[in-house]
Amino acid sequence: MHGERPTLGDIVLDLQPEPVSLSCNEQLDSSDSEDDHEQDQLDSSHNRQREQPTQQDLQVNLQSFKIVTHCVFCHCLVRLVVHCTATDIRQVHQLLMGTLNIVCPNCAATA
C-alpha cells in the first residue's frame, strides 16, 4: 500500500484457496473418567439384564473397529478391522497394550 490511506486498488488479492486434507489418522485416547463412566453404564445395564443375551441382542451391539498398529518384527504399518462389541474391543485394547503383538503378512510368511 502506498499513501496515507489504503484504497481498494492497493489491495492485491492474488492468493487462491488451496484444498487442505482434514483427515487425521490419529485417534485420541479417552480419559479415565470417560472410561469409568462408560463402564458404569455398562455395569448398570448388565445388572438390569441378568439373563443371557440372545444372539440377536449380540448382533445389534456389534460394531466394526479399525486397529492400526505396527508389526512387531519389521515395524511396518498393519491395519485390521474387527467386528465385535464395545466390551470386546476394550479387551483387545488391553491385550495390545500388554504382550499381544501383531505380525504383518510378510513376516508371518517367513516365521
Curated annotation (Swiss-Prot):
Zinc finger (unnamed): 71-107
Biased composition (Acidic residues): 29-38
InterPro entries associated with the record: Papilloma_E7
GO cellular component: host cell cytoplasm; host cell nucleus
Role played: Plays a role in viral genome replication by driving entry of quiescent cells into the cell cycle. Stimulation of progression from G1 to S phase allows the virus to efficiently use the cellular DNA replicating machinery to achieve viral genome replication. E7 protein has both transforming and trans-activating activities. Induces the disassembly of the E2F1 transcription factor from RB1, with subsequent transcriptional activation of E2F1-regulated S-phase genes. Interferes with host histone deacetylation mediated by HDAC1 and HDAC2, leading to transcription activation.
Family stated for the protein in its record: Belongs to the papillomaviridae E7 protein family.
Name under which the protein is recorded: Protein E7
Organism annotation: Human papillomavirus 7
Lineage, broadest ranks: Viruses, Monodnaviria, Shotokuvirae, Cossaviricota, Papovaviricetes
Name of the coding gene: E7
